[in-house]
Amino acid sequence: MADAVGEVLEGSWNQDLADALDSAVCDLNSDQDGVIQVRDLSPPQRAKLWMIALNVSGKGDSLSSWDGVLDLPEQTLIHSRSQQLIDELGIPVEEGRDLVSDVESVITFYCKSRNVTFTPDLSWPHILKPLLGLQLSRKDLYNCFYAIMNKYIPRDCIVKGRPFHLFRLLLQYHEPEFCSFLDTKKITPDSYAINWLGSLFSSHCLPEVTQALWDVYLQQADPFLIFFLMLIILVNAKDNILIQEGDNKEEIIKMLEQSPSLLEAEDIEDLFSLAQYYNSKTPLSLRKENHNLFGSSLVALKEEDMDLSQALCLPVSVPEILQANQLQPEGVRFFVVDCRPAEQYNAGHLSTAFHLDSDLMLHNPSELALSVKSLLEAQKQSLESGSVASGEHLCFMGSGREEEDMYMNMVLAHFLQKNKEFVSIAKGGFMALQQHLADINVEGPDNVYVHWIVSTSGSHSSLSSADGELNSTDGKGVKSLVNKMTFALKSKSVNVKEKVISFIENTSTPVERHVSSSDRVGKPYRGVKPVFSIGDEEEYDTDEIDSSSISDDDRKEIVNIQTWINKPDVKHHIPCNEVKETGHMFPSHLLITATHMYCLREIAARKGFAYIQSRQALNSVVKITSKKKHPELITFKFGNNNAAGVEIVAVERYLIPNAGDATKVIKQQIMKVLDALESS
């Protein structure tokens, strides 16, 4: 189709364009290569092109059911912005009066039909501005506006909104050095790109540039393409920004925000070519995991899945990892780095994965440095040899259990600090891989997925279950294999997990009780000194167990935050952020009573309410530590004394402003509890 319409003779331009538009009605949404090459379009021609691309050509009058009453609380603001928009276009008074009415009606009806409020910071007038140049009827103006809002403007396009966290991860993936520079300056994408995204660049581009850009963009029918266009804008601005290192934050933000204004109409073709190139170098998970940003989908995400603000790097799904290296060389191919301990890796791992024991990060840094060097050399050699395991894109895989992936996250942070591009993390880790192979539910030894998992241990006995060996070919297939691996990897922790659950149940006593002998957890043996201490977090216990490893969904209770803060037995209230091993943070509150420490995690969807995330007896606190470089990051370790020594049963980490004061009051309360126990 592109060949048929790309080159036209000047004399028959109008007719050829009309024919091309007519024939393109069914093709624009399915054939991304079928972009009609346009130039010097008249308003009616451009209107026809855009309406076909937006799939509103011939659509009925949505406004016909409306009574036309302009009575919203923010109506004065809507009228003012509508008048301002027409004034900017320099339209004669008579014609302008009708257009003001059209714009005000479109915005008002959209607000009423979608039950939203118009605010001064919205980019809607910028979206309407290019549409007004098409001389559309009020009906078509609304239909085009609605289609653009619905298909191309992402949800949560607000300050600190999810699209901007996603864009930061995309920037980090391709331009880690520039991303790090902006992070250092505390310049977030929403500070410079909120109007880019909210108006498809019309807020900052010249009218003729916006028209040329939309001519192509609307035909591409790809809402995620805006992120790659934004990326190219930043890549082009990077050199000028980096030399402004001495400038203050506001000046840099202003320079970034104005970058699209430098575009000219003849730049558009190159802009899209580069955007498509970067798109081809980006994991598809960016789209698939965030597809509900656009369109009419009202699919709700889990609270934790929605928060991209604290993600270390771009997450990639296990199915994409498995499929990617079967693609042609020009696609995204992953060099998978398995960061689990050697014991787990040897028990079973992705056949194409390179092993990097992240525990070495703390236990043997020099050996880790050699391993990293070997990793990069292996990646280089695999690329040169065209190995099935080769990939330009590094994807780190952990176990999928937060408490075990702490060191992997540190290794990952190390690579990011070195400005290594194309760095991602396998979403859900090795556990997600096991689950995916089980979910495909294909039985039999000939299943093509069987080769994905291999064991490098000398004996398979540790992986045996009641139905045979790991490498048996008795027809059990993938499910059997996965079940055995899951059994082997989890069996060792069953007893510990049961102990921890019992421990939490036994310490979840009502806060109204006073300290008594029944409150003791792990009463010290005769002659054994209390093990509670406060120190710097340089020494890690290798057997520590994060409390998040226990499924506590059934125990979570929803409470009113203020009601709990005001309880008479709450002695101290400490606002904080709970920090998970994945790097995610959740606004929380620590409440200290005479005997316990409670963590209330705020519920984003229910303001003023929180989950009771954890209850810990103060006399079970073994150690409170902090990082030298980040004194506000506090780690609490909880445990028991027994004949073998101290058994760590839970670890919790919090980011606490004025951490020194907070730990002081907690320590004082702990000492009171210990003194009471000693004297009882």
From Swiss-Prot:
Disruption phenotype: Morpholino knockdown of the protein causes reduced brain and eye size and curved tails at 48 hpf. It comes from the Eukaryota. Its main location: Golgi. Pfam families: RabGAP-TBC (PF00566), Rhodanese (PF00581), TBC1D23_C (PF19430). Residues 40-221 form the Rab-GAP TBC domain. The keyword Ubl conjugation does not apply. One of its GO terms (cellular component) is trans-Golgi network. InterPro entries: Rab-GAP-TBC_dom (IPR000195), Rab-GAP_TBC_sf (IPR035969), Rhodanese-like_dom (IPR001763), Rhodanese-like_dom_sf (IPR036873), TBC1D23 (IPR039755), TBC1D23_C (IPR045799). Keywords: Cytoplasmic vesicle, Developmental protein, Golgi apparatus. The keyword ATP-binding does not apply. One of its GO terms (biological process) is vesicle tethering to Golgi. This is TBC1 domain family member 23. The lineage of its organism: Eukaryota, Metazoa, Chordata, Craniata, Vertebrata. The gene is tbc1d23.
